[in-house]
Design a protein with these regions (language model features):
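Transmembrane-helix signature of 12-pass secondary carriers
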Residues: 2-488
């Protein structure tokens, strides 16, 4: 039996539950109680909120460089290859971090990993703010990427394992919340850029990117301060490790469920535990998981490639379309993210319990393909009409991302595998997705330099591949009791 730190002693819980006793005789009983989710879930919602806080920080750190990359290029006199190195360093770190984080999430538990990874963000953010050259900056961004990579598998595990199975706020909706959280973080980074752009004297405008990158340490410190008070281990993972008493304790504290383990269950021989190992990565390509892994991987790769090329390059794209000021670029980028990507993400959370992740992803890719083909045809806008149409196409792309694959690729990654494989499943998915991000972030400056707006013809291949993949593999993770596969 795996030894588990009593994380519940750190979680506030209010009064002890006094309702009907729910007897927990095995891990399947714990999963069923979580899936039903019919009783008070105040602390469970707090855990989900803190997990989303980690995702918020991931998004902020990944997107914070978008407006500063031009200033960094000028300050350090970077070539296109050097710009790509700085821009992609964080995703290189995330590739390594996701593999390690996925394994550790299954090996030592969600709680321990979640409590530790914020250190990467604090140290790296401060190092970025004071980087004397591009090499220190790239190194600090790599360390920051390690934190992002480690954080996402464990955050997705919490979102999956602290939500009910069906109905409003189900597992798919909980996981989809990562999407509007992501866009909220991007929008806040834009607002911070706008604020500091307004208050910094022109003689110190080169401080802007340093302040924005360094600011990431503040939310990390806040999360460190509050997560130790409210976080607890996943009851599903604890039960899966054979620790029913720990799982029942978490259910009482986080869910207000009066769960107890009967004495006869405690007297039973220790159950066979699904031990985490590096070989579990191979299990993702065996049996029924091969088909799911293939779909989740394809969707994540193409979605990440297209989104990073467009969203990271959004300020560059807008300033290319409209030879305007930095202020105009910031305001248009902020409006597009809030009105379309963020709103699309909120709709995804609300509608996925009804329509499912598969159909909503299909609709999102269709929107993106239409938008990218429109941008490719328009090229560099001439006149107001073409300029407005180009911005409308960018808006359609971002709405399709928020409504479709942006929200639901994580559902395919998180809810295609049971508890015993969820960490490595998300870890592998993130590794491959970040590889796609690295490629797009590195290639985007080079492609734009050589192809200008014709680059949209290349990017349009991504949603096309997503559409074909969904039509070829019709797997719906929403509403399916995936954790039951550990007990069959």
């Amino acid at each position: 039996m795996t030894e588990i730190t009593d994380s519940t002693s750190l979680a506030t819980a209010g009064k002890a539950p006094d309702g009907e006793i729910k007897w927990v005789r095995n891990a399947a009983d714990v999963t069923q109680l979580v899936n039903e989710g019919s009783q008070g879930r105040a602390n469970a919602r707090i855990v989900i909120g803190i997990a989303l806080g980690g995702i918020f920080l991931d998004a902020y750190d990944l997107g914070a460089l978008a407006f500063g990359i031009k200033d960094i290029t000028l300050e350090f006199n970077l070539t296109p290859a050097g710009t790509g190195m700085v821009a992609s360093a964080i995703t290189f770190g995330a590739i390594v971090g996701a593999l390690i984080g996925g394994y550790l999430t299954d090996k030592i538990g969600r709680y321990r990993v979640f409590m530790a990874d914020m250190v990467f963000f604090v140290v790296a953010a401060i190092a970025c703010a004071f980087a004397p050259n591009e090499y220190v900056l790239a190194g600090a961004r790599f360390v920051m990427g390690l934190g992002v990579g480690i954080d996402l598998p464990v955050a997705m595990a919490f979102l999956s394992e602290f939500a009910r199975l069906k109905g409003p706020g189900n597992k798919a909706a909980s996981v989809a919340m990562w999407c509007p959280t992501w866009y909220a973080a991007i929008s806040i980074s834009y607002l911070l850029v706008l604020f500091f752009y307004a208050v910094l004297p022109e003689t110190h405008s080169d401080w802007l990117w340093r302040i924005i990158l360094g600011f990431g340490a503040i939310p990390a410190l806040v999360i460190i301060a509050i997560r130790s008070k409210y976080m607890s281990e996943s009851p599903v993972w604890a039960a899966n490790q054979g620790n029913l008493k720990e799982a029942a304790s978490i259910l009482r504290k986080a869910y207000n469920i009066n769960a107890h383990v009967p004495q006869e269950a405690l007297n039973q021989p220790a159950p066979v535990v699904n031990k985490a190992s590096w070989s579990n990565y191979l299990n993702l390509f065996r049996g029924v998981y091969l088909r799911r892994t293939t779909l989740a991987t394809l969707l994540s790769i193409v979605s990440s490639f297209a989104y990073n090329a467009v969203a990271f390059g959004l300020p560059v794209i807008i300033s290319s379309f409209f030879v305007q000021s930095m202020l105009t670029t910031i305001l248009i980028s902020l409006a597009l993210n809030l009105l379309f990507a963020f709103v699309g993400g909120l709709l995804a959370v609300r509608l996925v319990p009804r329509f499912g992740a598969w159909r909503m992803s299909l609709a999102g890719y269709a929107c993106q393909l239409t938008a990218l083909l429109g941008l490719a045809i328009i090229g560099r806008p001439e006149g107001v009409a073409e300029g407005v149409t180009a911005v409308a196409m960018l808006a359609l792309f971002l709405f399709g991302q928020g409504f479709g694959p942006g929200a639901h690729t994580m559902a395919f990654a998180s809810l295609s595998y049971p508890t015993s494989l969820r960490g490595v499943g998300v870890g592998l998915n993130q590794t491959l997705m970040r590889s796609s991000s690295t490629l797009s972030l590195f290639m985007f400056p080079l492609l734009v330099a050589s192809m200008d707006t014709a680059v949209f013809w290349i990017i349009a291949l991504a949603p096309l591949i997503g559409l074909v993949s969904l039509l070829a593999i019709r797997w719906e993770p929403s509403g399916y009791d995936i954790d039951a596969e550990d007990y069959r």
